Amino acid sequence: MTLRINWFPDPNITHTVQPSAPSTVKVDFPVVARRNWLRATVLTVGDTYAQYSLQGDRIPPAGTYHVHCCAFAKHANAFTRVYMKVGGKYTVPLQKEIADGTTVDVDGTITIPDGCEELIVRIAAGNVVGAIGMMSDILIERADTYDAAVGGGFRASSPGTRCRAHRSVRRAGDVR
């Protein structure tokens, strides 16, 4: 049996990890469709993001990972981005634009190198007063254990905790 771990410490947005945001953005945590969300609402034009920063022992070990989240944009397009800091410099290995008025699944593969100093998962709302960007169900799982057919590992509670799907493999259309 392969152990599946979600390395993101608060995948269900339960406030165990606090996001950061500039003063140009209001951050709150609505529940929509029985799902907790991180919402960034633009108050003034400028930096328009809210983000989670993983450092130290919260950074997954070096390797290839599948990153997933659910994202939403309103009043302007938004972006979901993953940043990595290595050697004091930031790179953006994953970025997806979310069209105004849409909810999308963001999926991508990143490679975390040895010596990664910081990993950031960010929602950037459009640079328009009142624009909203939201994200939920954040997943960072080793690419070799990720299985989209069983929902990835996004429901795991914390690093080191098995995903619910580890007990049985269920495919779309199976009797539940």
Where are the regions that the model predicts?
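Extracellular glycan-recognition surfaces and repeat-rich motifs
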Residues: 11-39
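Extracellular beta-strand-rich recognition modules
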Residues: 65-69, 118-125
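Extracellular carbohydrate recognition and processing domains
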Residues: 89-118, 128
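Extra-cytoplasmic beta-strand recognition segments
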Residues: 13, 38, 42-81, 106-110, ...
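Extracellular polysaccharide-targeting segments
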Residues: 1-20, 124-176
